[in-house]
């Protein structure tokens, strides 16, 4: 009689603060955590940092950031990444915060109750043991717009993908990348280096992507390094009822065509939804998290919110408001991470070690 070997549990990452969302507010929060001496890690459902600024309007001008008369949304993200880079906090992309539970601790030797910690698990299986969670998820978790074909759900996660988490899984495969934005073109260009063949599929000749990226794609097509087809997904064909993907049927202006395919990467853009966070037993208002404006803590101890996801009277949906909210939230979170320490305010310019880190990164 044989017995199956049990799967090893996913390792748990222990840190002080988990920041949910790597948009502008989440990135500034990471910088603030570093300034305060907090360890942190960031997760985001997207495949890169920047949130809405990167995915929806990278070329949008922004004029209301203090001391920055004007910049493009992507430029702001790039500057925030540069600002928090000295602390080298890990960022985990393609990960949606899924479940939250409390980790009871044994009483301390002196008889005082130990601080309860939190365990956050993502849909990708990552687990984080933290003192506090700061949710900077904008209007909610951005979820990919899914393929609407009836055969798609059974193939999701196996042969139909909405993000590229591991390039190596596409090595030697015939890949169709569907979409017309920056993500679709970027990944089509990247995957052509490892895949047997890449075909970019878009419903029209024009793209919602940077001119330079479009030019690079057209050069790759002209050089025979990849293919480009104008059309829309019509059907997904498999080998048998539950077998792997073999072909993608495409509806074109002249009828239809069939593309050989082992993998489909659909990058149609994003839709906003509260996601599992809405089930974390916090007081919510219209899909946003009700917070105390003294600390920006939610009704659940140790869970904070900053940015558009936070709700309070006279809330202003401005990036600069999110910066302020994150800064105050982390100062309260510090007391959960280090209950025995007093947080002493120090100007960054007067802290020699911090100044050295920030100026010589």
Curated annotation (Swiss-Prot):
Keywords: FAD, Flavoprotein, NADP, Oxidoreductase
InterPro entries: FAD/NAD-bd_sf, FAD/NAD-binding_dom, Fd--NADP_Rdtase_type_2, Ferredoxin-NADP_redctase_2
Positions bound to FAD: 44, 52, 57, 97, 142, 308, 349
Class in the EC hierarchy, top level: oxidoreductase
Cofactor note: Binds 1 FAD per subunit.
Reactions catalysed: 2 reduced [2Fe-2S]-[ferredoxin] + NADP(+) + H(+) = 2 oxidized [2Fe-2S]-[ferredoxin] + NADPH
GO molecular function: ferredoxin-NADP+ reductase activity; flavin adenine dinucleotide binding; NADP binding
Gene3D superfamilies named among the record's database cross-references: FAD/NAD(P)-binding domain
Co-factor requirement: FAD
EC number: 1.18.1.2
Highest taxon, organism lineage: Bacteria
Endpoints of the signal sequence: none
Subunit structure: Homodimer.
Family matches, as HAMAP family: FENR2
Family: Belongs to the ferredoxin--NADP reductase type 2 family.
Protein name according to UniProt: Ferredoxin--NADP reductase 1
Protein's organism: Cupriavidus necator (strain ATCC 17699 / DSM 428 / KCTC 22496 / NCIMB 10442 / H16 / Stanier 337)
